[in-house]
Amino acid sequence: MLTWLSRTDFDFPPLDKALQEPNGLLAAGGDLNPQRLVAAYRHGCFPWYQDGQPILWWSPDPRTVLFPDELHVSRSLAKCLRQQRFEVTFNHDFRAVIQACAAPRDYADGTWITTPMQLAYQELHLRGIAHSVEVWQERQLVGGLYGLAMGRLFFGESMFSRADNASKVGFVTLVRHLRDAGFVLIDCQMPTRHLHSLGARAISRGEFADYLQRYRDQPPTGDLDF
């Protein structure tokens, strides 16, 4: 039975209460209050819904993650990185990145990054929790991604690309930066061929919860310098 959250109830049900079909649906309702969003990620779930739907909270099993030491860079991508065709920055234009991620795409109907969602994550950015990666070419924003950093974990949310390899260059740069700072896991949420090509793989929800419990409150061991 699906749990419905009130606007005053910040407690999520145990992860093992998530539905099998649709896979990982844990709860519905509530709001996108920053305190609730932080509680959700700390608990192991995230919001994902379309316009016109109630807020839906998910914890899929299995969970797609990337361990920084398992990052895979293909020969063609390595060549692109060596050519330095792009400039990569952190937290220079969070709003532009999330708006670009929310823009309509040819292969999808609508967007799950609704206006309330954008505003909520911009507030998390102002609080130093959400971060953006920008990829520039000739001073134009051509790719990027955003997500949340908690302890030694990074929770990726979405990425976009307007030039070949732009989002991959941004992602690889981020992963290397997080690895140097002592991060142990990057949550990719759901599987895609794009992420698997970079080394992401599936782990069980229980294993993901173990990493969450162990590392969400541990400070990075190196200089994060976002």
Curated annotation (Swiss-Prot):
Q: What is its EC number?
A: 2.3.2.6
Top-level taxon of origin: Bacteria
Q: Which residues form the signal peptide?
A: none
Q: Which SUPFAM superfamilies match?
A: Acyl-CoA N-acyltransferases (Nat)
Q: Which reaction equation describes what this protein catalyses?
A: N-terminal L-lysyl-[protein] + L-leucyl-tRNA(Leu) = N-terminal L-leucyl-L-lysyl-[protein] + tRNA(Leu) + H(+); N-terminal L-arginyl-[protein] + L-leucyl-tRNA(Leu) = N-terminal L-leucyl-L-arginyl-[protein] + tRNA(Leu) + H(+); L-phenylalanyl-tRNA(Phe) + an N-terminal L-alpha-aminoacyl-[protein] = an N-terminal L-phenylalanyl-L-alpha-aminoacyl-[protein] + tRNA(Phe)
HAMAP family on file: Leu_Phe_trans
**What does the similarity note say?**
Belongs to the L/F-transferase family.
Please give the name of this protein. Answer: Leucyl/phenylalanyl-tRNA--protein transferase
